[in-house]
Amino acid sequence: EVGLSAGLFYFPKYGEYEKYEASKRDISISDLQLVSWLLGECASVDDIKEAISKVRIISLDPQISTVHWRFADISGRQLVLEIIGGEPRFYENTLGVLTNSPGFDWQLTNLNNYVNLFPGAAPGQSLGVLRLSPFGSGSGFLGIPGDVTPPSRFVRAAFYQTSAPRQKTALDVVFQAFQILNSFDIPIGIEVATGEVAADIPSATQWTSVTDMQNRIVYFRTMYNSAIRSIDLNTIDFSSVQYHAKPLDRSKQQPIELSLIHI
């Protein structure tokens, strides 16, 4: 309700929380409960840094993957939080991008491998008497990784969002964000070997969301319905509302709009 946003992302094999100690249970909080607690207590990323300094982040089940977090406030400032060796590490996220493992600092370093990429078309050149020309627009991004691994998604997101043109309205920004995010949909099936059965909760893109923090509106679409829907947070009284959950989809069949052509 104050324009603070938070996101939790799987961070397997690289995070390490503090060990749970019964004597310190009053200042301990589960990694999966952290987002809800911070959104209820804080109004800015500075508030979050102060709040984290007063608690111990633990896991209720050490067998479950560790996670890391992205926080953003209405000023546009973003932070990444990772727990490494039991110690919280904050990173200023000026790119506004986060995926999964490896760590955020590694992902930034990896961008140096793609210093040759640029928006637009690559210039033509000559090989002796042979003249070479790009096949089409966007050839400046030839070589950008296209797979769905976290490092590749990080690279694509960094270059796509920084090259996106500025929009005039908030709604235009929302539509542009969804268009960019089209490039990150992970289809069901590629996460399991041939012949294996996907889990009940597949490691695929189940929903995509875009948050207009200025106007307090959350937009989303799902794997079953690509129509964009919204939740207006201004209509919710957060001082009195109780916990509430409902399915993202009423039906797993997307309605198809019929267009009539009059001749």
Regions found by a protein language model. Give the residues of each.
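A contiguous strand-loop segment
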Residues: 1-23, 63
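Compact, glycine/acidic-enriched structural inserts
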Residues: 13-55, 244-247
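Secretory/export targeting leaders with adjacent low-complexity proregions
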Residues: 41-79
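Extended amphipathic alpha-helical segments with heptad-repeat/coiled-coil character used for oligomerization
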Residues: 63-119
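Long, charge-rich alpha-helical interaction segments
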Residues: 107-171
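Extended, compositionally biased non-globular segments
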Residues: 143-221
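C-terminal soluble interaction/assembly domains
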Residues: 191, 198-203, 210, 217-252
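Conserved small/polar residues in nucleotide/adenosyl-binding loops
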Residues: 261-263
